[in-house]
Amino acid sequence: MRSEQEVNRAIEQYSDTVRRLCLIHLKNDADTEDIFQTVFLKYVLSSVSFESEEHEKAWFIRVTINACRDLLRSFFRSRTTPLHELMERPAEL
């Protein structure tokens, strides 16, 4: 587990990158926040030691992209209908 200083530094340094990647892939603020928390939780619990800042940044990018893809492939995501689509449909009798 990482120290609070390491986590705060990583959040300060990579939060913008993680959020932007999420928004590009998910186009949804709520899902972006969920993945953001997931990525940084993985970082906190990870015991990976990084060779350099570039290696650490690459880890954040890869973990973020993978988490976004996992969410997009998930059963829950594939079985939901956005509310705005339901509002546009005529009522079924």
Residue ranges and their predicted role:
Residues 13, 25, 62-63, 71:
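Conserved catalytic core of Hanks-type protein kinase domains
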Residues 30:
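Residues within helix-turn-helix
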Residues 86-93:
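Acidic, proline/glycine-rich intrinsically disordered inter-domain spacer in sigma factors
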